[in-house]
């Protein structure tokens, strides 16, 4: 019978989740062995199992081959045995014939001893020797007992049938042997029919027995042996009486021996046949097991192939992620190279600046040399003046005057010298400038002269060209000289020539005048050009000076900017220090906040267009959210399913559950192919848990048959979601429907899709988680910073240790391809464990976690600092395996004992002692650390002062009342910043034990709570933590009401709660009576609200409140509520039969115990049971009318009250018979008021340890109380401190 196996039965998650098993393995059949899920086996284990199965298969094959060989050998032996059996049957057929002949002739053998019968007897003996007698099962008896004759002597003898008797029974098989009787025997039998009648009948009976024994498997050896022994009697022919008897006896002995041998051979053959049957059966079983192993091997191979495909997909995804990381690193490398290039350019600029710096240094050296020379000259001048003053014979007072005058003169001369040096410097600068200008002017003048010479030469050349050749050698003379020369010449004929010459001269004069004009113009042009050049030079000098000034201004501006930049960096560092001191986010965290709180930019246009069924407004989705859609389309049921349903048109519907949502149900549909067409849409928050669910888990889908008002499950199937991560398109699939008995009842069509890609949504979700963590720490830091302002400066512990966990670098997750969500945990001295905030999905988390530990310097603390080390563990919030951590670092504390701070990076090692990043830690004292030996004398002095104040106790009690430094040191103190114990004086008298227990019980409660929680609840807790638990409204101490721990603060809720308070609470009466004793219960119960309940379902007893004119403000009242009480099972109170009923009371200034005790006594709670009182008391603290109560509270806060800053609750036993027994105090519980003042938060149902009156260190139970007093305590403390300082 073939068993159906669920194809998705192997798709188990790698890591089991504690909440809901996501995958249920399908049944493999009844005979199948339960195997471990293949998804939890790695590749090596699968290969080992595969090779093991292969070796087993080969061994089974070899065994089957050996069995086949053995079967062949057995077959040959069987053929041999069948042949031998045929021979034996022939001999057995011949034996009865001889026996009947022997019986018939027995009487005649003794009388007739003729010789003609001897050959016949010899023939019979030869026949027996040839064929051999049948081997009997047992030895033949020697005495002839005779046999029953089947036929009469006269009856005819029937012929022997060839195939056996026809009248055999129906359940016997026909004989399968052939007759091997010889012709000779047949002749003898035919010749003597009368003698062999009984023999033939015995042969027929023996053959029928043999034919019946063969199909049974030769399992009747005894009967065959008996029949063979009964039929193996052969009579010999008669002989002579002398020789017949001894031969008869020998023949019988030989025949008995031969029959015994044949019977042994038959037994052996039967045993061999039985062994052969057993081997055949074993072979059949082995073949069946081999078939089963082959089927298992095929299943293992298929599972291995599917697992290999999944692993290849995972490896491909990891490879793609690695490639993306490589690309990102390449981009970062390019950016870093660009930064390096810019830094190189800046370095070149720095080299230029270094050169200029060297020049300035040289100038400074020159100035220093001049300064040395001036100092030397001054010293020489001073020495000369002193020598001249010493040589003169003036009185001592005149020398002093002279020295003063000389000093004045020297100072004046020095001033003059300095002024002259400055003038000299100015003159030298002006001289250098003038020299430069002079050189420039000289160059310009030489250039102008050269140009002028060139122009003159050009003009002269032109003039020589214009004169006649005979006159070129004569110098140009004045016209008057020429005129005189012409007058000297007397001859008149030369007048014409003179006229011509005069004309030429006039022309020359005109040309000369033109030339002179041109030269003047040229000179004017040159002068103008010189002026222009001078202007240009002045402008150039102005531009140069302007450029120098600009350069100087630019350098000054750069220096100023660098100074401003340094100042800005210093301010940033100071602000970061302030932020770290107040636990506010730093710049890196603010960047994460900025990127984590900005809206997610999704390009909806790039997404594929969907059909008409998209009716969801995607814009309503928040950042980090995604929309998952699952559509159930249609089912196709088989005939087997319809037969199981008992209806050809069944009415069915489907149910399924997805992730942590509720179960969805499709509408009803009728028919063998029901069409559901139902879509479920889930708004998911993309995180690692959801991603893991989609990758590894599957959802179960059930098809139910509806019958009237009832329904029954018809079939079930599984839907896997891993393919939806690959695309944003619709992913269609078929789910196989399996019935309750494992039959296949059909398939179901469905599709699913994610609206947005999973990777950017996951990144946005991680950034948002980081932002919310940083914002929550910002709110905490702001609250702590404001709490610092309200803390009293009058009290401080002896010292305070600051421990800061700054950041971690290079953390690696235990799972490849994932980012850890780390947080750090450590324990200092005897304090409780302190853990940091959880930074989601970060390899380099910034914690900025600061913790302050107020300590008393004792020898134990000093020994701890000198011998021990601070062990810091870093855990991964996503790792669910217990005992695993990312890394551990050990910080030696010896420098703290030497009053030195500790700051640096410490290596983290994983459980295998391999490095896994580093952690930056800083430890520092608030005050200088002084070893405990220096406190011995001040301690004695304080003890002496306290003994003077306590005058009502004896000296022995007084010595016992003052604790030592070790006793004053709290073993555990709340480690949240801003929560310190109030400074108290040593307790007086008998309350020493109570005070010591108060410290122990207070330290036993763990106040710190990690911000991160598992999975989806972490985000809910963060939102509640920001909106409700840690808002700045808590620090302002205004509008604070009792509320549930998970309720939100709103106006409507406040109004509603104020109305409830108006109906359920009231102000206390103004009491002016003295404090009543403890056992006084006869006073009336006034102004209180009581509700008594043995269990949560019991009735409440309510005392109606007193009416009041107006509701009191929170700063004018306080409300104390006793909620419930429970005892530990091992406490002595539980075994004390005298304690039947208990009630709770407390003392408060002038209020009588009748108002502060629970009005109803409840029976003692059983083991593990909690009784509820719900007794609340509103105490009036009006500033004008109740100054005494306000002063009482201030004294408690300031440590001046005997109660030492806590409110004491007493659990009292109320006897049933009040006449015979009195009330007895059972235990005490203490509530710290400083805790409320420091934290600024009211206490809501806080559990207090109840201690025994005999042993204050032994808790016997817990008392749950609530106290609304934050606003009034803050107002009283502020008011009283202002009155003290004013």
From Swiss-Prot:
Q: Please give the annotated consequence of changing residue 1114 to G.
A: In LCA6; no effect on interaction with RPGR
* Subcellular localization, as worded in the UniProt entry: Cell projection, Cilium
Q: Which Gene3D superfamilies match?
A: C2 domain
Q: What is the effect of changing residue 1121 to A?
A: Nearly abolishes interaction with RPGR
What outcome is documented for mutating residue 589 to H in this protein? Does not affect the interaction with NPHP4
- The record's principal subcellular location, in a coarse class, is other
| Substitution effect: residue 1245 to K | No effect on interaction with RPGR
The UniProt entry's coiled-coil ranges are 294-584
> What's in the domain note?
The C2 domain does not bind calcium ions, and does not bind phosphoinositides.
Q: What is this protein called?
A: X-linked retinitis pigmentosa GTPase regulator-interacting protein 1
Which species does the entry assign this protein to?
Answer: Homo sapiens (Human)
Q: What is the lineage of its organism?
A: Eukaryota, Metazoa, Chordata, Craniata, Vertebrata
């Amino acid at each position: 019978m073939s068993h159906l196996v669920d194809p998705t039965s192997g798709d188990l998650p790698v890591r089991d989740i504690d909440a809901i098993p996501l995958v249920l393995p399908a049944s493999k059949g009844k005979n199948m062995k339960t195997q471990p899920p293949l998804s939890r086996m790695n590749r090596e284990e699968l290969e080992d199992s595969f090779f093991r199965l292969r070796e087993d298969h080969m061994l089974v094959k070899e065994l089957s081959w050996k069995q086949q060989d053995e079967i062949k050998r057995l077959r040959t032996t069987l053929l041999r045995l069948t042949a031998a059996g045929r021979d034996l049957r022939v001999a057995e057929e011949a034996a009865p014939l001889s026996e009947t002949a022997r019986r018939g002739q027995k009487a005649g053998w003794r009388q007739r001893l003729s010789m003609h019968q001897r050959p016949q007897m010899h023939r019979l003996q030869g026949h027996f020797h040839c064929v051999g007698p049948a081997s009997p099962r047992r030895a033949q008896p020697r005495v002839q007992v005779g046999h029953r004759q089947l036929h009469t002597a006269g009856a005819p003898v029937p012929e022997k049938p060839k195939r056996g008797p026809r009248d055999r029974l129906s359940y016997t098989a026909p004989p399968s042997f052939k007759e091997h009787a010889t012709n000779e025997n047949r002749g003898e039998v035919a010749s003597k029919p009368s003698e062999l009648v009984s023999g033939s009948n015995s042969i027929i009976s023996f053959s029928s027995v043999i034919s019946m024994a063969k199909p049974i498997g030769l399992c009747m050896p005894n009967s065959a042996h008996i029949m063979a022994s009964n039929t193996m009697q052969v009579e010999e022919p008669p002989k002579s009486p002398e020789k017949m008897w001894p031969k008869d006896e020998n023949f019988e002995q030989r025949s008995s021996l031969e029959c015994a041998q044949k019977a042994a051979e038959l037994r052996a053959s039967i045993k061999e046949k039985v062994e052969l049957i057993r081997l055949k059966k074993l072979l059949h079983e082995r073949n069946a097991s081999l078939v089963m192993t082959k089927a298992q091997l095929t299943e293992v191979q298929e599972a291995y192939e599917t697992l290999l495909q999944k692993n290849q997909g995972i490896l491909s995804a990891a490879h793609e992620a690695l490639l993306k990381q490589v690309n990102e690193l390449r981009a970062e490398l390019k950016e870093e190279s660009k930064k390096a290039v810019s830094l190189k350019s800046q370095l070149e600029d720095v080299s230029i600046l270094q050169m200029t710096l060297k020049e300035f240094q040289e100038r400074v050296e020159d100035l220093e040399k001049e300064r040395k020379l001036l100092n030397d000259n001054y010293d020489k001048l001073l020495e000369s003046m002193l020598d001249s003053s010493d040589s003169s014979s003036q009185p001592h007072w005149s020398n002093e005057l002279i020295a003063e005058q000389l000093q004045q003169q020297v100072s004046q001369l020095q001033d003059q010298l300095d002024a002259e040096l400055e003038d000299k410097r100015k003159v030298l600068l002006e001289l250098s400038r003038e020299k430069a200008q002079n050189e420039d002017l000289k160059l310009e003048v030489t250039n102008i002269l050269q140009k002028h010479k060139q122009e003159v030469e050009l003009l002269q050349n032109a003039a020589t060209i214009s004169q006649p050749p005979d006159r070129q050698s004569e110098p140009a003379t004045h016209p008057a000289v020429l005129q005189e020369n012409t007058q000297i010449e007397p001859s008149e004929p030369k007048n014409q020539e003179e006229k011509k010459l005069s004309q030429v001269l006039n022309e020359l004069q005109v040309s000369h005048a033109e030339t002179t004009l041109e030269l003047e113009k040229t000179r004017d042009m040159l002068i103008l050009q010189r002026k222009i050049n001078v202007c240009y030079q002045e402008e150039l000098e102005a531009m140069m000076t302007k450029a120098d000034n600009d350069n100087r201004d630019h350098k000054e501006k750069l220096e100023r900017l660098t100074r401003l930049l340094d100042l800005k960096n210093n301010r940033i560092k100071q602000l970061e220090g302030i932020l770290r001191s107040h636990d506010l986010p730093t710049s890196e965290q603010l960047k994460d906040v900025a990127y984590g709180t900005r809206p997610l930019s999704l390009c909806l246009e790039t997404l594929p267009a969907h059909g008409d069924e998209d009716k969801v407004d995607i814009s309503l989705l928040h950042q980090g959210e995604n929309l998952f859609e699952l559509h159930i389309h249609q089912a196709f049921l088989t005939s087997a399913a319809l037969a199981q349903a008992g209806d050809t048109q069944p009415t069915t519907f489907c149910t399924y559950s997805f992730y942590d949502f509720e179960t969805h149900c499709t509408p009803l549909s009728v028919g063998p192919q029901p069409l559901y067409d139902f879509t479920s849409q889930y708004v998911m928050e993309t995180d690692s848990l959801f991603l893991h669910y989609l990758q590894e888990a599957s959802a179960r889908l059930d098809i139910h048959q509806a019958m009237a008002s009832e329904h029954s499950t018809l079939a079930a199937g599984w839907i896997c979601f891993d393919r939806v991560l690959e695309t944003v398109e619709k992913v269609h699939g078929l789910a196989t429907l399996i019935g309750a008995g494992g039959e296949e009842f059909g398939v179901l069509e469905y599709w699913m899709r994610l609206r947005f890609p999973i990777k950017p949504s996951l990144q946005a979700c991680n950034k948002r988680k980081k932002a919310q963590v940083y914002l929550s720490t910002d709110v905490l830091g702001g609250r702590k910073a404001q709490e610092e302002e309200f803390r009293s400066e009058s009290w401080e512990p002896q010292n305070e240790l600051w421990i800061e966990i700054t950041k971690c670098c290079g953390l690696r997750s235990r799972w490849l391809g994932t980012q850890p969500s780390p947080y750090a945990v450590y324990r200092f001295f005897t304090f409780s464990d302190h853990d940091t905030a959880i930074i989601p999905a970060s390899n380099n988390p910034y914690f900025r976690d600061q913790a302050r530990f107020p300590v008393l310097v004792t020898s134990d603390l000093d020994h701890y600092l000198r011998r021990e080390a601070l062990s810091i563990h870093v855990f991964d919030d996503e790792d669910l395996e217990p005992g695993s951590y990312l890394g551990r670092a050990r910080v030696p504390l010896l420098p703290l004992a030497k009053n030195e701070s500790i700051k640096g990076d410490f290596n983290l090692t994983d459980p295998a002692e391999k490095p896994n990043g580093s952690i930056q830690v800083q430890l520092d004292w608030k005050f200088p650390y002084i070893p405990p030996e220096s406190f011995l004398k001040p301690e004695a002095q304080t003890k002496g002062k306290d003994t003077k104040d306590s005058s009502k106790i004896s000296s022995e009690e007084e010595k016992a009342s003052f604790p030592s430094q070790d006793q004053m040191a709290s073993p555990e103190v709340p480690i949240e910043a801003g929560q310190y114990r109030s400074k108290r004086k040593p307790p007086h008298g008998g309350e020493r034990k109570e005070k010591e227990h108060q410290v122990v019980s207070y330290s036993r409660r763990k106040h710190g709570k990690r911000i991160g929680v598992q999975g989806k609840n972490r985000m809910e807790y963060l939102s509640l933590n920001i909106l409700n638990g840690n808002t700045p409204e808590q620090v302002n101490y205004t509008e604070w009401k009792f509320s549930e721990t998970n309720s939100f603060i709103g106006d409507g809720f406040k109004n509603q709660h104020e109305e409830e308070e108006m109906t359920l609470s009231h102000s206390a009466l103004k009491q002016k009576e003295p404090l009543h004793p403890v056992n006084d219960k006869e006073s009336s119960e006034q102004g209180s609200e009581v509700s008594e309940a043995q269990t949560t379902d019991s009735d409440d007893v309510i005392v109606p409140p007193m009416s009041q004119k107006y509701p009191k403000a929170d700063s004018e009242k306080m409300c104390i509520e006793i909620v419930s009480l429970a005892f530990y099972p091992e406490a002595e109170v539980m075994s004390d039969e005298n304690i039947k009923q208990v009630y709770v009371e407390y003392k408060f200034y002038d209020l009588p115990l009748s108002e502060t005790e629970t009005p109803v006594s409840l029976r003692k709670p059983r083991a593990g049971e909690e009784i509820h009182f719900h007794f609340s008391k509103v105490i009036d603290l009006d500033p004008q009318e109740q100054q005494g109560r306000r002063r009482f509270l201030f004294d408690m806060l300031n440590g001046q009250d005997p109660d030492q800053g806590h409110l004491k609750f007493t659990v009292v036993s109320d006897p049933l018979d009040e006449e015979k027994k009195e009330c007895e105090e059972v235990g005490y519980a203490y509530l710290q008021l400083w805790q409320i003042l420091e934290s600024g938060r009211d206490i809501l149902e806080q559990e207090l340890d109840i201690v025994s009156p005999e042993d204050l260190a032994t808790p016997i139970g817990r008392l749950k109380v609530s106290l609304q007093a934050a606003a009034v305590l803050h107002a009283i403390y502020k008011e009283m401190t202002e009155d003290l300082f004013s």
